[in-house]
Amino acid sequence: MSQELRAIVRVGDTDLEGNKQVAYALAKIRGIGIASAYAICWKLGIDPHAVLGALPEEQINKLDWAVRNLHEVAPAWFLNRRKDPETGRDMHLIGSELVLAAKRDVDLMKKLKSWKGIRHSLGLKVRGQRTVTTGRLGAVAGVTKKKATPGK
């Protein structure tokens, strides 16, 4: 039975290349790394080295469901947003949800004027890195050479 290879497969609101292996294609989704991709494949019983575009539609639908509902498939320590401040639930965010959640977290820190929020608002390092020599802002003045006086 000759099955056609789909060039683009849509999983988790992301267009994935159909000619890549399942695990590496899934890792292109923001919020899904290579470890998460292998775990999803293992949990669903799909060969992670199979070509994504050659999978039947039912397996692609299973992959889509697992990517969207990783909190139901994986243990809590595997998720990227545990104990969400708003809901208190363990979640795994993907795509633009992940970016917006990170932005909301930073904006909340700025609003509360916590130490991290102040550092974020000033554009400084947040996680305790040294700032004596690195992370300098602004243009560099540089060194200019004096003009040689003629005749001397």
Swiss-Prot record:
Keywords: Ribonucleoprotein, Ribosomal protein, RNA-binding, rRNA-binding. InterPro entries: Rbsml_uS13_C (IPR027437), Ribosomal_uS13 (IPR001892), Ribosomal_uS13-like_H2TH (IPR010979), Ribosomal_uS13_archaeal (IPR019977), Ribosomal_uS13_CS (IPR018269). GO terms for cellular component: cytosol; small ribosomal subunit. PROSITE patterns: RIBOSOMAL_S13_1, RIBOSOMAL_S13_2. Signal peptide: none annotated. GO terms for molecular function: rRNA binding; structural constituent of ribosome. Pfam families: Ribosomal_S13. GO terms for biological process: translation. Part of the 30S ribosomal subunit. Forms a loose heterodimer with protein S19. Forms two bridges to the 50S subunit in the 70S ribosome. PANTHER family: 30S RIBOSOMAL PROTEIN S13/40S RIBOSOMAL PROTEIN S18, SMALL RIBOSOMAL SUBUNIT PROTEIN US13. Located at the top of the head of the 30S subunit, it contacts several helices of the 16S rRNA. In the 70S ribosome it contacts the 23S rRNA (bridge B1a) and protein L5 of the 50S subunit (bridge B1b), connecting the 2 subunits; these bridges are implicated in subunit movement. Belongs to the universal ribosomal protein uS13 family. This is Small ribosomal subunit protein uS13. It comes from Pyrobaculum arsenaticum (strain DSM 13514 / JCM 11321 / PZ6).
